[in-house]
């Protein structure tokens, strides 16, 4: 596995794209659609990763936007979502798809409110998720791992975030965290920043300019037709237009470069754990 030595690059955006084009990448998604929503612009900008695996943790679900599909039940919904994942892998040139088969929060008894307010530590599936994610990271042999930052506090995202943080130690792959969408787009920008820096202990790694590929990102979102509506797309793009790079200051990785590229209409940010003692 590669050493995480790219953080000090003069142009972290370009360096990250080149890293994904040349190396082995593990894309960790709590549910089908999270990668497409949250870092699909980065993947579109990369073009075709050298070898990328999409690892989706909670792949059993009864939720879908179309009422007819919802009425068909969890087995049919889960199969539809698997088909959407495979189409997305083909669209983005991802080499492998690895579903872990866990039931999502809705099937575990959460409702719309409790899935966004419950601590991951109390969930009985936590240990099994941590074990499965750790095994998948070992098997992937990736030099870069992209995983959710758990912005928004969805219990499934918290479980996956914690599992990845626990699985990757010193000398492991470069581990980066994307801003969970559309959740980040539904929250005040200051609150998002506070969650990332204070609650998660992360610092900026790169602000990826996706302006030239934003329509490709949207196309990838609509691959997940069972989940994606126009409101979701609007929230996602609104977050990308917030101009977040101009707020980055100080001695964090990528901050100077991002601040210098003012006015990029659409961006995706990725974060990395703060150095020990930096919080």
Swiss-Prot record:
Originating organism: Streptomyces fradiae
Entry annotated with the keyword Hydrolase: yes
Keyword DNA repair listed: no
Pfam families linked to this entry: PIG-L
Reaction(s) catalysed by this chain's protein: 2'-N-acetylparomamine + H2O = paromamine + acetate; 2'''-acetyl-6'''-hydroxyneomycin C + H2O = 6'''-deamino-6'''-hydroxyneomycin C + acetate
Entry EC no(s): 3.5.1.112, 3.5.1.113
Pathway: Antibiotic biosynthesis; neomycin biosynthesis
Family: Belongs to the PIGL family.
Cofactor requirements of the protein: Zn(2+)
Signal peptide location: none
Disordered as annotated region, ranges: 245-279
Role this protein plays: Deacetylase involved in the biosynthesis of neomycin by mediating 2 steps of the pathway. Deacetylates both 2'-N-acetylparomamine and 2'''-acetyl-6'''-hydroxyneomycin C.
GO MF, one example: metal ion binding
Name listed for the protein in its UniProt record: 2'-N-acetylparomamine deacetylase
A biological process term (GO) from this entry: neomycin biosynthetic process
Cofactor-binding details, from the entry: Binds 1 zinc ion per subunit.
Entry keywords, A to Z: Antibiotic biosynthesis, Hydrolase, Metal-binding, Transferase, Zinc
Residues holding Zn(2+): 31, 34, 157
Positions with biased composition (Low complexity): 246-258
């Amino acid at each position: 596995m590669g050493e995480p030595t790219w953080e000090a690059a003069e142009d972290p955006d370009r360096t990250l794209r080149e890293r994904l084009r040349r190396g082995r990448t593990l894309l960790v998604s709590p549910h089908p659609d999270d990668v497409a929503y949250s870092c699909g612009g980065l993947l579109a900008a990369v073009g075709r990763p050298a070898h990328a695996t999409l690892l989706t943790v909670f792949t059993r679900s009864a939720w879908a936007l179309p009422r007819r599909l919802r009425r068909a039940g969890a087995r049919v919904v889960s199969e539809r979502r698997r088909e959407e994942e495979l189409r997305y892998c083909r669209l983005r040139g991802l080499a492998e798809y690895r579903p872990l088969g866990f039931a999502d929060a809705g099937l575990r008894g959460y409702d719309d409110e409790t899935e966004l307010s419950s601590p991951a530590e109390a969930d009985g599936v936590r240990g099994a998720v941590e074990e499965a994610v750790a095994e998948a990271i070992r098997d992937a042999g990736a030099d870069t791992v992209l995983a959710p930052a758990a912005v928004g506090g969805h219990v499934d995202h918290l479980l996956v975030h914690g599992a990845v943080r626990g699985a990757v130690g010193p000398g492991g792959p470069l581990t980066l965290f994307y801003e969970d969408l559309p959740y980040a787009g539904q929250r005040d920008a200051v609150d998002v920043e506070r969650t990332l820096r204070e609650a998660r202990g992360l610092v900026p790694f790169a602000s990826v300019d996706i302006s030239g590929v934003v329509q490709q990102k949207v196309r990838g979102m609509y691959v997940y037709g069972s989940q994606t509506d126009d409101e979701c797309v609007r929230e996602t793009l609104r977050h990308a237009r917030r101009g977040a790079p101009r707020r980055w200051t100080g001695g964090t990785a990528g901050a100077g470069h991002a601040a210098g590229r003012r006015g990029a209409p659409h961006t995706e940010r990725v974060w990395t754990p703060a150095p020990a003692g930096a919080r």
